[in-house]
UniProtKB/Swiss-Prot annotation:
This is Glutamate racemase. It is an enzyme of class 5 (isomerase). Substrate binds at residues 9-10, 41-42, 74-75, 185-186. GO terms for molecular function: glutamate racemase activity. Keywords: Cell shape, Cell wall biogenesis/degradation, Isomerase, Peptidoglycan synthesis. Pfam families: Asp_Glu_race. InterPro entries: Asp/Glu/hydantoin_racemase (IPR015942), Asp/Glu_race (IPR001920), Asp/Glu_racemase_AS_1 (IPR018187), Asp/Glu_racemase_AS_2 (IPR033134), Glu_race (IPR004391). It comes from Actinobacillus pleuropneumoniae serotype 5b (strain L20). HAMAP family: Glu_racemase. The gene is murI.
Length: 265
């Protein structure tokens, strides 16, 4: 049997995690939900994030037997994992800022955490820094603007360079910053633009490969001799808006057969 893996995020940034997992497990069956009715998650309360996580996973699991859920969002992962693991028997993998590898690789021991405001302010992240980067200076930028810029790039192919530059302005002249953690699954999609704006930064760290390895370790993938029926990769959204058909084309380009509305009624 092909393992069925559900990934979800508030937007399409989690596609960076999907892409990393797909390269490791190309024959798995993928479902992807972006919770656009509650985008961006960084502006939602912890209770709302937990409620949405349970509703999304429950609804999709009713129709598709799931082998794994990947919370492809840093902000949600700092909050929802205990609730999901308590309710569901299949493995739940989260996405957290790659503070440990960043602290290990930084030569100047000066790290930048680029994430959403919600992620930057979570006590969980402070605990990770205390545990793995105690000997480092950790500079933080919490931004919702960059999430919006990435969603715009996904839809149009264009990036507003002026707005992007303003987001990281305080780091552009930083004398010792050599490592930046891309602490939101959206941000690897503007890695090249960030490299141009921050030429003194040697390392940009994102969690994609680490998560792919973790998922692979938890799943034993078996490739069937005959193609399985009814195993199409399907994407879901939680609200239909004027961008629906454009998003459907984008999801098809990423290997999903169609985009459906996830109806909770």
């Amino acid at each position: 049997m092909k393992p069925t893996i559900l990934l979800y995020d508030s937007g399409m940034g989690g596609l960076t995690i999907y892409d990393a997992i797909r390269q490791t497990l190309p024959n798995a069956h993928y479902l992807y939900c972006f919770d656009n009715a509650y985008f961006p998650y960084s502006e939602r309360s912890e209770n709302v994030l937990i409620e949405q996580a349970v509703k999304i996973v429950q609804k999709i699991a009713e129709k598709y037997p799931l082998d794994m859920v990947v919370v492809a969002c840093n902000t949600a992962s700092t909050v929802v994992l205990p609730a999901l693991r308590e309710k569901f028997a299949f493995p739940i993998v989260g996405t957290v800022p790659a503070i440990k590898p960043a602290a290990a690789i930084s030569q100047t021991k000066t790290i930048g955490l680029l994430a959403t405001k919600g992620t930057v302010e979570r006590p969980y992240v402070a605990e990770l820094i205390e545990k793995y980067a105690k000997d480092c200076i950790v500079e933080k930028i919490g931004t919702t603007t960059l999430v919006e810029l990435v969603e715009e790039k996904i839809r149009t192919g264009n990036v507003d360079q002026d707005r992007l530059s303003k987001v990281v302005a305080e780091w552009q002249t930083h004398p010792t910053l050599d490592t930046v953690i891309l602490g939101c699954t959206h941000f690897p999609l503007v890695k090249q633009e960030l490299q141009q704006l921050l030429p003194n930064v040697k390392y940009f760290i994102d969690p994609g490969n680490g998560i792919a390895n973790r998922v692979s370790a938890l799943l034993s993938e078996s490739v069937p001799e005959e193609p399985e029926q009814n195993k199409e990769n399907i994407a879901f959204c939680t609200k239909i808006d004027e961008e629906f058909f454009k998003r459907e084309v984008i999801m098809q380009q990423w290997g999903f057969k169609r985009l459906e509305l996830l109806n909770f009624l």
